[in-house]
């Protein structure tokens, strides 16, 4: 979406130390408003709760057998941090409508900071900051490693 001057409305969000659900809801609202959103440091996004319970919950969802007939009929679940976050945002968008699909297409999620975004100003949302958590939390990168992610950057 273009502003009156012709420049695109684009924002770069630093995901390190942010609560996943709260960050995903803010990002979903920005996407529906027409912003192009880039989220960097996806592996440092925080999930609140007991780490063992969070990993076990994701493990049963992602690695659970949904079809005993054939592995190719099983639902394909994300295992990388950037896809896990994008899947969370997707759940907060009207994905079956053209408006929601266009909004999801404007989202880019990265592990680390890519070269083309270095030097840009990163935005942080205080309502999604993990400093409000008292103790139990785990980073999305640690959950992804438990699910089989090798720690590489997706192209």
UniProtKB/Swiss-Prot annotation:
Q: Mind telling me what this protein is named?
A: Large ribosomal subunit protein uL13
Q: Which InterPro entries match?
A: Ribosomal_uL13, Ribosomal_uL13_bac-type, Ribosomal_uL13_CS, Ribosomal_uL13_euk/arc, Ribosomal_uL13_sf
Organism of origin is Aeropyrum pernix (strain ATCC 700893 / DSM 11879 / JCM 9820 / NBRC 100138 / K1)
PROSITE patterns xrefs: RIBOSOMAL_L13
Q: Mind giving the lineage of the organism this protein is from?
A: Archaea, Thermoproteota, Thermoprotei, Desulfurococcales, Desulfurococcaceae
Recorded hits in HAMAP family, A to Z, give:
Ribosomal_uL13
- Subunit composition and interactions: Part of the 50S ribosomal subunit.
Q: The organism sits in which domain of life? A: Archaea
MF (Gene Ontology):
mRNA binding; structural constituent of ribosome
Q: Which NCBIfam families match?
A: L13_A_E, PRK06394.1
